[in-house]
Each structure stands twice: as structure tokens, then as C-alpha cells.
Curated annotation (Swiss-Prot):
Annotated binding of gibberellin A3, by residue: S114, Y125, S189, F236, G318
Free-text tissue specificity from the UniProt record: Widely expressed.
Record's subcellular location: Nucleus
Organism: Arabidopsis thaliana
Name this polypeptide is given: Gibberellin receptor GID1C
Modified residues (N-acetylalanine): A2
GO molecular function, one term: hydrolase activity
Domain of life, source organism: Eukaryota
Positions of gibberellin A4 binding: G113, S114, Y125, S189, G318
Record gene name: GID1C
GO cellular component: nucleus
Amino acid sequence: MAGSEEVNLIESKTVVPLNTWVLISNFKLAYNLLRRPDGTFNRHLAEFLDRKVPANANPVNGVFSFDVIIDRQTNLLSRVYRPADAGTSPSITDLQNPVDGEIVPVIVFFHGGSFAHSSANSAIYDTLCRRLVGLCGAVVVSVNYRRAPENRYPCAYDDGWAVLKWVNSSSWLRSKKDSKVRIFLAGDSSGGNIVHNVAVRAVESRIDVLGNILLNPMFGGTERTESEKRLDGKYFVTVRDRDWYWRAFLPEGEDREHPACSPFGPRSKSLEGLSFPKSLVVVAGLDLIQDWQLKYAEGLKKAGQEVKLLYLEQATIGFYLLPNNNHFHTVMDEIAAFVNAECQ
């Protein structure tokens, strides 16, 4: 069982930079207010507490953005981020001009939030996507997928799949060198989970995805692992929290052996023999579900898939949101190298 909140806060303060600690502690407080014991969720309060930013066609630090409706029936929206030439200010007619580059990676990004929180226009994810543009010289398409518990499995996967198909069919995203859309999938927490499941659909439909980037991906199972027992409540998250989110997302009556939660469990499809994208799996050593993340990386390896595991021993959840720690710079360098290796 987790210790007292006072002890947990003291422990987390010793390893987390102050502004990151404040950021994630505020998230934890808000999340506790939003979840209800009966499995419902205070969406109105969640939207009020989540600081959002609009798309901005005026370049900021060399990046401009705009929102696109992908599916009017489901109100599926994505925010597109593009590099801007120095000193230019694109007009509305320029937003979907062909990409200007021999090879331009396109990163389809899925935000975190345990399937229930945040959105494509959340300030923290707007900032992260802008960083990815500058880091990789990429176009980033951030998916505003439907959230649980109002929209359970497989809604988030369906939305991710719809955006991937839209990206793949968008001629203005093709690199000049070979007229191909060079697609990467990336996401954190629940977004990392969505990356895996959308990639499986891509393989089955023969849409070429060059790589998957999973930051602290949200996976699980019915057993309690060593890391879940050891880190329960110590660094912002409890096992009880995670259980609530799985109950909110999975089909009613399902347990955590469902393939959406346990991708290499007894009920999941085998990836052996499939042309699955190569993967970069980033694991924080102070994330209580790290054992499930490590099991995921091992599952890819056993299935004969290419995977690079980046294990950061003293990192906590959310370390990649603020550039105030060495782990942030390490993972950003790894992401850039991972993407650039396929864009020579």
C-alpha cells in the first residue's frame, strides 16, 4: 500500500525539479477532483481546469499551426504544426501548401491523459508538439481523439486511425524526393498506447509507418507487478488511479487482460512475421507501470520486431514536458536521431 501523502510528496520533491513537481502535483489534484467513485467524470470542470491555447497561423519560434476537421460526424479535429520560413507570415491559403523539403517527416501525435484528460489544444501539448517540429524539422499532426469514459474503447483508436488515413492521403504532405508521406506515430501515456494500436491497423492495411515513439506508454494487466507495489503512490500516481482509468476506457465488464491494456497478453494478436514499424520505447524509472512498459518492449523483441529501449532511472512521469532536467534533453536527442535515421 502507498504511504501517507506527506511522505509521498517529500520523496517526489527530492528527484523532481520544482516547476515539474508543481505542474504534475496540480494535475494530480485536479484529476482527483474530476474522477467520481461511480466511474463518471466531471467533464465540464475538466475543460475549465485544462489551460488551452488556440491555433496560431502567425509563426512563433519558427512554427505556425492550424486546426483541421477530419470527420464532421464525430467532430474529430487535429491540430497541424508546420515549420515557417524566417520572416514569413502565411495566409489562410498557404496552410496546406506542399511541404518544402526533399524529405519531411510527418509525426502523428497522440496526447496523454490516461484516455480521459487533456486534448490537442492543451497548452502543455501545444508546446511539446511545437518542440517536435523544431527538433525534427517535421510536420506534426496532433489528434484530438474522443476521451473516456464518455467514449470508451475503441473510439480513441478509431480516431487515430482516421487521422492516419487522412495524413497518408494528403498530397501536400508528400516529400519531394519520392512523393511519399514519411509517417511516424508518437504519443505519451495513453497516447503511447494508441500509437501501438493504430500501428497494428496500419500494418494490416499496408499503410507504411516508419517508426513508433512511445513515451511512458500506458499498458497494464491483471497481476500486480513489482514496480506497481514498490512505487504505488510515491511519484504522483497510485495503482487505484490506474485501475479507475482502465475501467473508464475498456468495454464494460472487461478486465485488464483485454488486448487494449495488455498488447502481449494471452488474448492479443501476435506480431510475429508482420512488418511492424521500428519502435522507440521510453521508460521512466519512477513510473509505477514501468514493468508493463518493459514487458511491452520485450514483447516486441520476442516477436522479431526492431525496438530501442530508453530507460531513464531517475525520471518520473511528465519529465519530457519541461526542459528543466537532463532526462528531457536525452529523450529529445533520441527522438531526433530516431526520426532523422529514416529521413536521410
